[in-house]
Amino acid sequence: MPQPENYQNSTTYFTYPEKVDGVLLRKKYRIRIYDYSDRVIKLERKRKSDSWIYKEDAPLTHEQFDRILAGDYEFLRDSEHQLCREFYVECVCNVMRPRVIVDYEREPWILDAGTVRITFDMNVRAAVGGFDVFDATLPVLPVLEPGKLVMEVKFTEFLPQVVRDLLPGKAQELTSASKYVLCYDKASYLRGFDYWQEGWSVPSL
């Protein structure tokens, strides 16, 4: 495994008004960028079934991201990407709205002989005061204790023994560590803020 390059990961999470507990939520949408750049913008959907996770993504432009934040979803309905069209339905019919921005630095490692990816997420923090993932000036709140990070081990078929042997005994069981939940809970004092006062509207189908 060659020495990886760290990168900044900034993600705006969207959820339903009545479902904010990331532990029970089986489906989450998010818009992700890297290093505060608009070179790559992804709309992602993460589905969870028991301990297994399935991810899909579709590309967005900066202009499209701005339109989504402004509550303009019409372009999603006519997108060539099915994920965008389904996101349109979620926003219009199920009132899906942005809830929190999750920021962190990631160090990725990939095992050459297999489909194993190990990531170390450091300086995990919740951005508050807005949902513009490109705004690097938003205030942030750290969510982890000093000296701690989130390690994720991702694999598609099986976890090689060489990797399993590196993990502490208790970590060899499948567990969930949601950065979304950590950040949402950290910013919980803002829950009295009325999201619907920010110009959000529900467009007609």
Task: Say what each PLM segment does.
Residues 1-205:
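Phosphate-end processing signature that detects enzymes handling 5′-triphosphorylated RNA
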